[in-house]
UniProtKB/Swiss-Prot annotation:
CDD domains: GntK. Disulfide bonds: none annotated. The keyword Nucleotide-binding applies. ATP binds at residues 11-18. It catalyses: D-gluconate + ATP = 6-phospho-D-gluconate + ADP + H(+). It is an enzyme of class 2 (transferase). Keywords: ATP-binding, Kinase, Nucleotide-binding, Transferase. This is Probable gluconokinase. One of its GO terms (biological process) is carbohydrate metabolic process. It comes from Homo sapiens. It comes from the Eukaryota. The gene is IDNK. Its EC number is 2.7.1.12. NCBIfam families: therm_gnt_kin. Belongs to the gluconokinase GntK/GntV family.
Length: 187
């Protein structure tokens, strides 16, 4: 596989996606997006009330993120995206657009899209106990710790043929960044 045009830092809430993604983008000199910043207000309210999002909530949000990634990568900008992307279908939407879902992504059907976006998925994984402990310490986030169990239930960890690496959140942030950088050197 060619070097990725984009990196997806994924995992459940509290896995460190935003922290790792922002530091990684800074280290690489790539553009950084935090998918949480693109949730519609309705999604934020729903999660704030402790109601898990369903596919109908997530698909328009993922399509929007796909369109942003596609525009940047097509213009030569390399990107790091921090996004839960819990299901393979969600990761497919990020790389391929609306294929396989009932909703059309704005950019997906345009002729400028020559091929599937080259994406390296970085799955930050950890136990429920470790991650729930992190969430309990976090302040000011719209995602309440009570929704973590539903995220673990929804999670479909990446598997072949996806282009991915899995890194334990038991490592410190600098070890995680070093592992990702080493992986990129091999691509």
């Amino acid at each position: 596989m060619a070097a990725p045009g984009a990196l997806l830092v994924m995992g459940v809430s509290g896995s460190g996606k935003s922290t790792v993604g922002a530091l990684l983008a800074s280290e690489l000199g790539w553009k950084f997006y935090d998918a949480d910043d693109y949730h519609p207000e309705e999604n934020r309210r729903k999660m704030g009330k402790g109601i898990p999002l369903n596919d109908q909530d997530r698909i328009p949000w993922l399509c929007n993120l796909h369109d942003i990634l596609l525009r940047d990568v097509a213009s030569g900008q390399r990107v790091v995206l921090a996004c839960s992307a819990l299901k393979k279908t969600y990761r497919d939407i990020l790389t391929q657009g609306k294929d396989g879902v009932a909703l059309k992504c704005e950019e997906s059907g345009k002729e400028a899209k020559q091929a599937e976006m080259q994406l390296l998925v970085v799955h930050l994984s950890g136990s429920f106990e470790v991650i729930s402990g992190r969430l309990l310490k976090r302040e000011g986030h719209f995602m309440p710790p009570e929704l973590l169990q539903s995220q673990f239930e929804t999670l479909e960890p990446p598997a072949a043929p996806e282009n991915f690496i899995q890194i334990s959140v038991d490592k410190n942030v600098s070890e995680i960044i070093a592992t990702i950088m080493e992986t990129l050197k091999m691509k």
